[in-house]
Regions:
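Non-catalytic, conserved peripheral segments adjacent to functional cores
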Residues: 1-105, 124-126, 133-184
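Conserved SET/PR-domain catalytic core that frames the SAM/AdoMet-binding pocket
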Residues: 103-120
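Ligand-binding loop in jelly-roll beta-barrel domains
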Residues: 115-131
Length: 184
């Protein structure tokens, strides 16, 4: 298992070791000891999974303190473009984002720490997306930023006319309207 630092501090790409033969493959998708030695102490409290069709875009979501969440995300089947936006005021990468292609084939994972907005777009016919979170979901602390904000300039790998976004995500505030609750 490799833990790869990215250009945004505290965000990591994780590449598991995959052992395959004619029967299929085996991989260790999470190891607490290795994770904590390489990244940070963590206590995941919930695993979630979603299935989406091509063009679905979920995001950009986060939860405000005290229910802010770190996430460990992966694509079990299909192909997604996963995005994390730094919301930590005072961070040298505040307002910047990282995009990583996660696929059922490459088995990569992305660790998104607290203080980031997160989203993904589905690039394949369908995709199964799984993620761990380190804090409970709380609807009253649920928040987000508009996925197509020109200040963020995120290329989601889709044409705008093929994007399917929830009604809730269509009315999220733009970056210029956003007041971050996070500090670096």
């Amino acid at each position: 298992m490799k833990f790869i630092k990215t250009e945004i501090s505290d965000v990591y790409i994780i590449e598991p070791s995959v052992f395959g033969d004619e029967r299929g493959y085996f991989l260790e998708s999470f190891n607490l000891k290795k994770f904590e030695e390489s990244i940070c102490p963590i206590k995941f409290v919930q695993d979630n999974e979603s299935k989406s069709s091509k063009g679905v875009l979920r995001g950009l979501h986060f939860q405000k303190p005290p229910f802010h969440q770190a996430k460990l995300v992966r694509c079990v089947e299909g192909n997604v473009l996963d995005v994390a936006v730094d919301l930590r005021k005072g961070s040298p990468t505040y307002g910047k984002h990282i995009s990583v292609e996660l696929t059922g084939e490459n088995k990569k994972q992305l660790f998104v720490p607290r203080g980031f907005a997160h989203g993904f777009s589905v690039l394949s016919k369908t995709a199964v997306f799984a993620y761990k979170v380190d804090n409970d979901y709380s609807p009253e602390y649920d928040a987000g930023i508009r996925w197509n904000d020109t200040n963020l300039n995120i290329n989601w790998g889709l044409e705008e006319n093929e994007v399917l976004v929830s009604e809730k995500d269509k009315v999220l505030p733009f970056w210029s309207e956003f007041d971050t609750p996070f500090n670096f």
